[in-house]
C-alpha cells in the first residue's frame, strides 16, 4: 500500500539517523480475532534515544493506529509517509483544523500547520488507493507535502503522539465505514454514491435491530420492494396485458401477411393501435422496468465494497461470490420461473429468452453473494406479485366484456365491408 519500507519511519536529525546503528528488541505481537485487530510493539534505541512504537492493525477497515513515544531525544520528530505503492502522481493534500483543503500542484512542496488530516489519493475507482493520516488524542501535527511521481507526506509530531492511518481503497463505502467521508474535501460522492450511502446507512440501522447481515439484506430487499411497489405494479400490469394482446397482434399480422402496399400497412398499424387502446396497454409502461436499475447498481457497489464481519448460512463472506455455487443454481431457476410467469401466454417467447439466462448465470457466479441473495429474493417477490397482477388483469378483461371489431383475413379495412367477431376485452 505504502511505497518502500520507510512507512512510519522516524527522523530527528542526528538523534535518529538511518545511517547509525540501532539496538532493537524483538517485537511483541498480540492478535485478537474476536476484535479483528492485531497489536505489535516495537522498541529500539539509537544514540541513547529510546523509541517505543505501537502499531494496531484493523484489517477489515484498513486502519492502522500508530502510537509513538520518544525518550531522551528531541521534542519533535518526523514520520514519513512516502507514496502510494505503484501509484503515479497521486493527489497530495491536507486540511488544517478549521481551514480549507490545500494541495500540492506538480512537483512543488507545501507546509500545512495543525492539520485535521493529510492524504495521498489516486482518482476514485475500484482499484484506486488512498493514504490518510489523521491526528488522535489531541496530537498536534504539522506536515510538509511533496508532489511529484510518488508524492510524500512528512509529518512533524511531538515526542509522544497518536495517529490514525488509513491505507486502503479510495472508494466511498470503504471510506464511509472507516469514518472518513465526513472529512472536508476528501471525497465527493456522485449520484450512485449518494444512493449507496443511503443503502449502507439503512443496512447499519437494520443490523442494530436484526444482528445478522444476511437477514439484513433480506429485510432490505423486502423494504425496497415495498417502496418500489407502485412502479413495479404499473410495469406488472403492462406485462400482463401484453400477454393477452400478443396473440391478437399475431392474428392481425397474419391477416396482412404478404400485403406490402401502403394502404394495407396503414390499416394494420391502425388495428394494432386500436388493439392497444382497447386493452389499455401503454407501450411506455415498459420503461418502469428500468427505474429499479439505479438502486440495483448502487446496491451492487455497496455490498461489493462493504466489509461484513460475519457470513450467512454456508456463505463465509457476503461481499464475495458463493464458493459452492448454490446461489447461482437458485438464481437460474428463480429467473426461469419469472420468465415463465411473464411469457406463459407465448411459449415460443419463453424458449427464445430462456437461453439468455444461461448468459446471466455468469453474473451470478461472479457477483457478491449478498447481491445474488438480494436478486433471488427480489425475483421471488416479483413472481408472487406478477401472479397476483395477472389474475387481476384477467378478471378485469373477462368482466368488461367489450366487443372489439376485428377485420377478417382477406378483407380491406376502413371503407370496405368488414366481418367482425366478438371477444372479451377491456373498455377503452
UniProtKB/Swiss-Prot annotation:
The chain crosses the membrane at residues 209-229, 283-303, 323-343, 356-376. Keywords: Cell membrane, Chaperone, Membrane, Protein transport, Transmembrane, Transmembrane helix, Transport. InterPro entries: YidC/ALB3/OXA1/COX18, YidC/Oxa/ALB_C, YidC_ALB_C, YidC_periplasmic_sf. GO terms for molecular function: membrane insertase activity. Required for the insertion and/or proper folding and/or complex formation of integral membrane proteins into the membrane. Involved in integration of membrane proteins that insert both dependently and independently of the Sec translocase complex, as well as at least some lipoproteins. Aids folding of multispanning membrane proteins. Interacts with the Sec translocase complex via SecD. Specifically interacts with transmembrane segments of nascent integral membrane proteins during membrane integration. This is Membrane protein insertase YidC. The gene is yidC.
Amino acid at each position: 500500500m505504502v511505497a518502500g519500507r520507510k512507512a512510519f519511519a522516524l527522523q530527528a536529525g542526528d538523534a535518529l539517523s538511518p545511517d547509525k546503528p540501532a539496538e532493537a528488541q524483538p517485537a511483541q505481537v498480540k492478535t485478537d480475532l474476536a476484535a479483528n485487530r492485531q497489536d505489535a510493539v516495537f522498541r529500539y534505541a539509537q544514540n541513547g534515544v529510546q523509541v517505543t512504537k505501537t502499531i494496531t492493525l484493523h484489517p477489515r477497515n484498513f486502519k492502522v493506529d500508530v502510537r509513538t513515544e520518544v525518550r531522551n531525544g528531541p521534542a519533535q520528530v518526523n514520520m514519513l509517509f512516502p507514496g502510494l505503492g505503484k501509484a503515479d502522481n497521486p493527489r497530495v493534500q491536507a486540511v488544517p483544523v478549521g481551514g480549507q483543503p490545500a494541495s500540492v500542484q506538480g512537483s512543488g512542496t507545501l507546509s500545512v500547520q495543525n492539520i485535521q488530516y493529510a492524504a495521498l489519493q489516486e482518482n476514485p475507482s475500484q482499484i484506486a488507493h488512498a493514504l490518510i493520516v489523521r491526528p488522535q488524542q489531541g496530537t498536534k501535527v504539522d506536515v510538509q507535502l511533496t508532489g511529484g511521481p510518488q508524492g510524500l507526506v512528512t509529518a512533524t509530531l511531538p515526542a509522544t503522539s497518536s495517529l490514525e492511518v488509513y491505507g486502503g481503497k479510495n472508494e466511498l463505502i470503504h471510506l464511509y465505514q472507516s469514518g472518513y467521508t465526513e472529512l472536508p474535501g476528501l471525497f465527493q460522492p456522485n449520484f450512485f454514491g449518494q444512493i449507496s450511502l443511503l443503502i449502507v446507512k439503512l443496512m447499519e440501522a437494520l443490523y442494530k435491530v436484526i444482528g445478522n447481515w444476511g437477514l439484513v439484506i433480506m429485510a432490505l430487499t423486502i423494504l425496497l420492494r415495498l417502496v418500489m411497489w407502485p412502479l413495479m405494479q404499473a410495469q406488472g400490469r403492462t406485462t400482463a396485458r401484453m400477454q393477452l394482446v400478443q396473440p391478437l397482434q399475431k392474428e392481425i399480422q397474419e391477416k396482412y401477411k404478404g400485403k406490402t402496399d401502403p394502404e394495407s400497412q396503414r390499416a394494420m398499424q391502425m388495428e394494432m393501435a386500436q388493439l392497444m387502446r382497447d386493452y389499455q396497454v401503454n407501450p411506455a409502461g415498459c420503461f418502469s422496468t428500468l427505474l429499479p436499475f439505479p438502486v440495483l447498481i448502487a446496491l451492487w457497489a455497496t455490498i461489493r465494497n462493504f466489509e461484513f464481519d460475519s457470513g450467512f448460512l454456508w456463505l463465509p463472506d457476503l461481499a464475495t461470490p458463493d464458493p459452492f455455487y448454490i446461489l447461482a443454481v437458485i438464481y437460474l431457476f428463480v429467473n426461469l420461473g419469472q420468465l415463465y410467469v411473464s411469457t406463459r401466454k407465448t411459449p415460443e417467447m419463453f424458449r427464445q429468452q430462456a437461453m439468455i439466462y444461461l448468459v446471466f448465470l455468469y453474473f451470478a457466479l461472479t457477483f457478491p453473494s449478498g447481491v445474488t441473495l438480494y436478486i433471488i429474493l427480489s425475483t421471488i417477490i416479483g413472481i408472487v406479485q406478477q401472479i397476483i397482477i395477472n389474475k387481476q388483469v384477467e378478471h378485469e378483461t373477462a368482466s368488461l366484456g367489450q366487443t372489439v371489431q376485428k377485420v377478417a383475413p382477406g378483407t380491406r379495412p376502413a371503407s370496405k365491408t368488414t366481418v367482425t367477431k366478438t371477444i372479451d376485452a377491456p373498455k377503452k
